[in-house]
A protein has these predicted regions:
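Internal alpha-helical scaffold of NAD(P)-dependent oxidoreductase catalytic cores
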Residues: 40-45, 49, 130, 134-135, ...
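NAD(P)-dependent Rossmann-like dehydrogenase/reductase catalytic/cofactor-binding core
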Residues: 2, 227-307
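Short, hydrophobic beta-strand segments that form beta-sheet elements in well-ordered domains
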Residues: 29-33, 115-118, 159-162
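Short, well-ordered alpha-helices that flank and scaffold nucleotide-derived cofactor binding pockets
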Residues: 15, 19, 23, 44, ...
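Rossmann-like NAD(P)(H) cofactor-binding subdomain of soluble oxidoreductases
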Residues: 36, 69-150
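Phosphate-coordination loops involved in phosphoryl transfer and adenosine-cofactor binding
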Residues: 1-4, 112, 156
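NAD(P)+-binding Rossmann beta1-loop-alpha1 motif at the extreme N-terminus of oxidoreductases
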Residues: 1-77, 81
């Protein structure tokens, strides 16, 4: 018998999970989004499911934390909760309020179900209203970038899982079936886990953009700037993965060439001030975390950069 799943909030993460599960033979029952057009598009991408939208309802609403606006809930809850597993893949700002509204409306239809969300920062508490009606709740977050138009492969991706025992077992099973690697995480550590991802990967968007802009100031076209930096960045990632950050560390600071740092600082005095500040902050961070002699390297780096 095929396993069944409903998906609430079919953005990039929801569509990816839905498509991958559909490919594995899961029955996709309901796909719920803010609008009919978005839900139909999500069903088209996933390849299965009944499109549903959040609409007007008699007295049941949830509040979006980011905007403070109220939205109404009206849909076929029998269809949604006919599934064994219900995924909430919505944005963090709306998840607790939306889950509460769903749980109140679904009532005992939640009993025996497994309700999971994919937030990197929120934990099972966001789904606590379902637990009060007898559902097992938890979270499973894939450490993967979902930007762009290409649906990411989840093979070998780490899934951080936490929650009630039955929810964790299901999350681990789903992660493994997707080719991923489930890793248990303590509820209290989820925010730190997400901060690690943003520090290691999310900040790259800004640092690489800064590098591209500096090359444009040096006379490169945008295309040529990308051709110059991207192979370098890819090679650095390969080296870090292979031998670790400390062994892979390269550049003037790793060689103790403080005169080069001083020249960089002078060159960066014109242009975007935030780039110079970021350069100095990242150099000091490298001196603290990667160098073999942090105290001395930090001191000389600060002198070279005049910070």
């Amino acid at each position: 018998m095929k396993r069944t799943v409903s998906i609430v909030g079919a953005g990039r993460v929801g569509r990816t999970l839905g498509r991958r599960l559909h490919d594995l033979g899961w029955r996709i029952l309901a796909v719920v989004t803010r609008s009919s057009a978005k839900s139909r598009e999500a069903v088209r991408v996933i390849g299965a499911g009944t499109p549903m939208r959040l609409g007007r309802s008699a007295g049941l609403h949830f509040r979006e934390r980011k905007t403070g606006s109220m939205r109404a809930l009206a849909l076929n809850l029998d269809k949604v909760f006919a599934a064994e597993v219900i995924f909430f893949t919505t944005a963090d700002d709306v998840l607790p309020s939306l889950a509460g509204a769903f749980a109140r409306l679904a009532g005992d239809r939640s009993r025996g179900r497994i309700v999971l969300h994919t937030s990197a920062t929120l934990d099972r508490v966001a789904l606590a209203p379902f637990a009060r009606y007898g559902a097992a709740v938890g979270s499973m977050h894939p450490m993967q970038a979902f930007g762009g138009s290409v649906m990411p492969n989840l093979k070998n991706v780490i899934f951080a899982v936490e929650g009630d025992p039955r929810a964790v077992r299901m999350a681990e099973s789903i992660a493994k079936s997707l080719g991923g690697i489930p890793v248990p995480i303590a509820t209290r550590d989820k925010t730190l886990y997400h901060a690690a991802a943003v520090m290691a990967a999310g900040s790259l968007y800004a640092t690489i953009e800064a590098g591209l802009q500096l090359l444009e100031r040096a006379g490169f076209t945008r295309r040529r700037a990308g051709q110059t930096l991207f192979p370098l960045v890819r090679q650095i990632f390969d080296n870090i993965e292979r031998i670790g950050p400390r062994a892979a560390w390269t550049g003037p600071l790793s060689r103790g060439d403080y005169e080069i740092l001083a020249r960089h600082a002078r060159a960066l005095r014109t242009g975007v001030p935030e780039i110079r500040k970021a350069y100095a902050a990242l150099a000091m961070l490298a001196a603290s975390l990667v160098s073999a002699n942090p105290h001395e390297v930090k001191k000389r780096t600060a002198q070279a950069l005049d910070v």
